[in-house]
Amino acid sequence: MNKILQINNLDYYYQDGQNTRTIFNNLNYGFEKGKFYSIVGESGSGKTTLLILLAGLDEPKKGQILFGGKDIKDIGYDNYHKRNVQIIFQNYNLLNYLNAYDNVLTAISISDPKRKISKEMLDEYLNTFGIDKTKANRKVNKLSGGEQQRVAIARAIACNGEIILADEPTGNLDYDTSLAIMKLFRQLVDDYGKTVIMVTHNKELAEMTDTIIHIDQRNKNIYE
């Protein structure tokens, strides 16, 4: 199988006052390219921590994470995060003083400063995510929650990352909007070959993914 991300013998812990709190112990797992994963578990079990580690925003205490067979530490965390991985948060994490166009363009300029995209191309691109010209010209804090999340997803995909990490992306959305967002993720996987890894508390949404990963808080590990 084509493993785009591979976790090898990973330990992660942190100091909590005088105590050491272990989150993961000897974690091993491989994520296949072009698959849709959900991560489920109790609050505080380490779901978001796992996403942060996969994004290269923190380092494991032991072990390694491989992207395309290379340790992300050797790739360089900054390069890895900018070029290969995009994160979508529950609270959208958009630049509220900018409109949808400029949110996407700002992200592109950070991930690939040499890349140019025309207004016409951006119009067509955002429209595929349900953001028409009128909405695209509004400051994003004037859009609905579902529309803001669509902009966040469009921004992530525009950066051409192969991996999309989503932390409770539907947590603030109603049921119908949540289903629409899940449909977008499915299209990214099936039509564009992206790998989507999503944290969720929603069992119904988790069952829409290809693989459900459970975090075992007692054994500090994961299983399908």
Kindly give the residue locations of the regions a language model identified.
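Conserved ABC transporter NBD signature motif
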Residues: 63-72
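Conserved ABC ATPase "signature" region
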Residues: 117-134
